[in-house]
Amino acid sequence: MIVRFDEISDDARIWIYQSNKLFSNDQIKIIKNRIQDFLNSWTSHGNELKVASKIKYCYFIIIALDQNTSLASGCSIDKMVHFIKNLENEFGVRLLDRLDISYKINNEIFISNLKDFKDKILEKKIDNTTIVFNNLINLKSDLTNCWEIPLSKSWHKQLIK
């Protein structure tokens, strides 16, 4: 059962898939339809799942699952990863590459590979106050306080040495 993102519980499990390229408005419409179709058929051991999704900043696909009603099984998570891989192929983007790092400078979002991110740190274009996206969070409640955070408070800080 699909619900609005703001209606799903704060303790819902989330998955964040970050694109290495900005999605256009036309692409977002198509992607939202694809996500809707996938979520309508997404089950765990035959049980319907209470789910929600959103696309944030034209880069991030966020899928939420209310685990109070049903838990995702390994097979259901595999189906989601397969779905995400299909989106990668269809739109020519990377959504599963955890070595792409996203950050904000002057409210503009940038995506860099790990090497470029480290180079920007050395060039002093990125510092401890730079806002980074911690896509490793896994609860909806963490989107508010733990997703967009200063580099100094994220796992990314280990890259500054």
Language model features: what each stretch is:
Residues 3, 10-56:
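Long, hydrophobic N-terminal alpha-helical segment
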Residues 22, 69-71, 104:
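Short histidine/acidic/glycine/proline-rich micro-motifs that form metal-
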Residues 1-4, 161:
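Short, Lys/Arg-enriched, disordered terminal segments
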Residues 50-52, 90-100:
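Short, flexible active-site-proximal loops enriched in glycine and acidic residues
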Residues 14-18, 60-64, 100-102:
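Ordered hydrophobic segments in well-structured contexts
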Residues 48-62, 66-71:
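Short, intrinsically disordered low-complexity segments
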Residues 96-161:
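Terminal interaction module
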Residues 66-95:
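Helix-adjacent hinge/juxtasegments
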